[in-house]
A protein has these predicted regions:
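Charged, amphipathic alpha-helical regulatory modules used
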Residues: 1-100
Length: 100
């Protein structure tokens, strides 16, 4: 059975996922130090839910594609697949035995 996250762990998990989105940086703004670090915050919730549900890669890829469509930008399928693989590996390695 999954262990319930402490509040500090939940914040850490959220921050780490936000950092992954910032690293992916589909808009290309994270090179600007004055740009807010929460640019991709609204995409973390749906991403986290899919990760918690152990969604298939394709479902996560579809979500990232729709998020990028919403932003009005695109990314290569390979870039999206690498990003999804990285998110899933991070979650499985560190957080898969936990729950909110």
């Amino acid at each position: 059975m999954a262990r319930k996250l402490e509040k500090a762990e939940s914040r850490e998990r959220w921050r780490e996922l936000r950092d992954l989105w910032n690293e992916f940086d589909p808009i290309g703004i994270m090179d600007y130090p004055d740009w807010p670090r929460d640019e991709y915050e609204s995409y973390c919730g749906p991403s986290m839910r899919l990760l918690e549900q152990n969604a298939e890669n394709e479902e996560l890829e579809d979500y990232v594609h729709s998020a990028l469509d919403y932003m009005g930008i695109g990314a290569s399928d390979d870039a999206i697949k690498r990003f999804v693989k990285k998110m899933k590996a991070w979650f499985q390695e560190k957080w898969s035995e936990t729950r909110v």
